[in-house]
Curated annotation (Swiss-Prot):
One GO cellular component, as annotated: actin body
Compartments, record wording: Cytoplasm, Cytoskeleton, Actin patch; Cytoplasm, Cytoskeleton
Biological role stated in the UniProt entry: F-actin-capping proteins bind in a Ca(2+)-independent manner to the fast growing ends of actin filaments (barbed end) thereby blocking the exchange of subunits at these ends. Unlike other capping proteins (such as gelsolin and severin), these proteins do not sever actin filaments.
Pfam families: F_actin_cap_B
Compositional bias (Gly residues): 87-106
Disordered: region residues: 73-110
Predominant localisation class: cytoplasm
A GO biological-process term: mitotic actomyosin contractile ring assembly
InterPro entries in the cross-refs: CapZ_alpha/beta, CapZ_alpha/beta_2, CAPZB, CAPZB_N, F-actin_capping_bsu_CS
Superkingdom per UniProt: Eukaryota
Record GO terms (molecular function): actin filament binding
Protein name: F-actin-capping protein subunit beta
Annotated organism of origin: Neurospora crassa (strain ATCC 24698 / 74-OR23-1A / CBS 708.71 / DSM 1257 / FGSC 987)
Entry keywords, A to Z: Actin capping, Actin-binding, Cytoplasm, Cytoskeleton
Amino acid sequence: MATADPFDSALDLLRRLNPKHTAEHLNNLITLAPDLTEDLLSSVDQPLTVKRCKQTGRDYLLCDYNRDGDSYRSPWSNQFDPPLEGGNQGGSGGDGEGDGGEGGAAGSIMPGERVRKMEIKANEAFDVYRELYYEGGVSSVYFWNLDDGFAGVVLLKKSSPTNPSSSGVWDSIHVFEASERGRTSNYRLTSTVILSLATKGNALGEVDLSGNMTRQVEQDLPVENDESHIANIGRLVEDMELKMRNLLQEVYFGKAKDVVGDLRSVGSLSEGQRDRDAQMEIIGSMRKA
């Protein structure tokens, strides 16, 4: 009998566990199999963590794409926290194309000067998008260089106000590659939404809905300048989020509502039994007639 690949087994196990606790499960797996650390961190989407930039005082989101070892790069200052060994910190306007050392996947390489300028504009654009669509929350955008273009990730996080009886967290992760081909560019976008909703009360008990959904799209769009890239990426992300929201609302939550409605009655059991008895009595009377 062939031995199962440890990495595939770890991914299969994570798919069967509550996605609300993905970060905890991931840490446990890494403890058990340290040699899978980099592969798991780069392959598993987990709820986003918020950190504050020490240079600007602005919040930003952490992921594998802005990670280098145990350090994370702020999109606002372009600085790593904690500082990288060797002093390779980049900067708000430097080209910073040197390797950042061992660690995260694409996030270990600082973006070049041109890509960094686009990254700054993208963060400004999605900061406005976040405020308009989410009315709060945190957003971060990270770009890095590719041989035939560039790639990046758009992160958005919104948590409901702290409430002892209910909670909700939305994390969306949009990873894209842009391959430049003259006056057009090919965009490949992979979007993941991680959603967690929980509520509890004396009347309805405790309900916990958690899960994630991933969708992909590829499209060729015209490009006139670097600002066109920002507009194209923004349009792709906006369209994808709209589609995924509709899917969640109409398909997933709609189906969950139907299942709960079939399994659980809002009224008391005695009232339900009385209704059934009355119904049977009416049916019996009709048969006698």
